[in-house]
Amino acid sequence: MYSAYVQSLLYNVLFDDHRFAEPGALSFDHWSFFWGGEPKHFPYDQNSLNEHLYWQMVRSGYVGIACEPSCIFQICNHPAILGFRMHDVLTGGSRAEEVVTGYEQAWRDFGRLDPGGHYNMMVSGDTRAVRPNALKAPWVDAWCGSLMNMWNRDFVCQHYPRQLAEILVPGEDGALSVVFPPPMEAMGRQVVNDTCDFGWVAVWASEIGDADTLTGLLTHASTTSPGTGRTSPNRWSPRSPTPST
């Protein structure tokens, strides 16, 4: 998934710049003193990276590419699909169409939605067990819906109103906030982290074109968090007590 985010930033499409088509232009270096061993260098360019991600999709049966070991999140494969679409624009190919057809069938078999109508979070690559969004975490629906909207808009818009209604909290003066789900438990411990629920719901509303919801969310942000820049009033930081200079 992380490589797919890089793949989707094809400069040829965005800026008419071919720098990342050069061999080795997209190279990844990895070394950790915790594990020992020599540093590893992975040289790619936009074409070889596209090829690498494509074959990972094929080998998985089009379920997707695991972004953590054996964890194939439904969310995390939409950047790859976007990258395939942009690569097809450059090459005249049809790889995105093939991948989407296989991906749709694979997730139709597993179930794109859980019994509660929320997006299933992930499939385990080894056991093929489906993990639902049992806690109704806003980030799961919002992140998945935001990214899937660029190629599967009718499906996303069909389920958006009901999914959204379960996570919004109305406030004063039209403000809208987002419910805070209970912490996830893993191996007997509670995991508390910032999953960016509010931010992803704002992105989701923006991608859908839901101006009323987006305005309500931005109203909440304006009244609870100070701005971080004089030239960018719509950037907020809840940890900054005063505006940044």
Residue ranges and their predicted role:
Residues A142, P243-T245:
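C-terminal capping/lid segments that line or modulate ligand- or cofactor-binding pockets
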Residues A4, Y54, E104, G145, ...:
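Non-transmembrane alpha-helical segments in soluble domains
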Residues Y2-E22, L26-G36, P79-G92, W143-D154, ...:
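Well-ordered alpha-helical scaffold segments within catalytic/enzyme domains
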Residues Y5-V13, N47-G61:
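Long, hydrophobic/aromatic-enriched structural stretches that serve as scaffold segments
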Residues C196-G227:
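Extracellular low-complexity, Gly/Ser/Thr-rich intrinsically disordered linkers
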Residues N12, Q105-R108, S222-P226:
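Amphipathic alpha-helical segments of tetratricopeptide repeats
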Residues A221-P243:
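Conserved blade-ending motifs and adjacent loop-strand segments that build the rim/top face
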Residues F33-Y44, S48, R59-V63, C67-C196:
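Extended ligand-binding clefts on enzyme/binding-domain cores
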